Amino acid sequence: MLNQIIARKKEHIQTLQLPVDGHFERRSFKEALMNPHRSIGLIAEVKKASPSKGIIQPNFDPLQTAKA
């Protein structure tokens, strides 16, 4: 039984290997973000304050900041 598990795991690992030349097709970052087939184009962080700088934006509106 253990030998079967090991054999299946080895097969699975082989499917995860890099291509022979080690290169992947390069894509445009902008095109990847604007792809209509994806629901999320960008994940961003907006902050009112920083631990080292304190308040960055006193009148903080996260939605407006994210849209800007």
Curated annotation (Swiss-Prot):
Top EC class, one word: lyase
SUPFAM superfamilies registered for this protein in UniProt: Ribulose-phoshate binding barrel
GO terms classed as biological process: L-tryptophan biosynthetic process
GO molecular function, one term: indole-3-glycerol-phosphate synthase activity
Keywords: Amino-acid biosynthesis, Aromatic amino acid biosynthesis, Decarboxylase, Lyase, Tryptophan biosynthesis
Pathway given in the UniProt record: Amino-acid biosynthesis; L-tryptophan biosynthesis; L-tryptophan from chorismate: step 4/5
EC number, UniProt record: 4.1.1.48
InterPro entries listed in its UniProt record: Aldolase_TIM, Indole-3-glycerol_P_synth_dom, Indole-3-GlycerolPSynthase_CS, RibuloseP-bd_barrel
Catalytic activity: 1-(2-carboxyphenylamino)-1-deoxy-D-ribulose 5-phosphate + H(+) = (1S,2R)-1-C-(indol-3-yl)glycerol 3-phosphate + CO2 + H2O
Pfam families named among the record's database cross-references: IGPS
Family of this protein: Belongs to the TrpC family.
Annotated protein name in UniProt: Indole-3-glycerol phosphate synthase
Origin species: Bacillus pumilus
Lineage, opening ranks: Bacteria, Bacillati, Bacillota, Bacilli, Bacillales
Gene: trpC
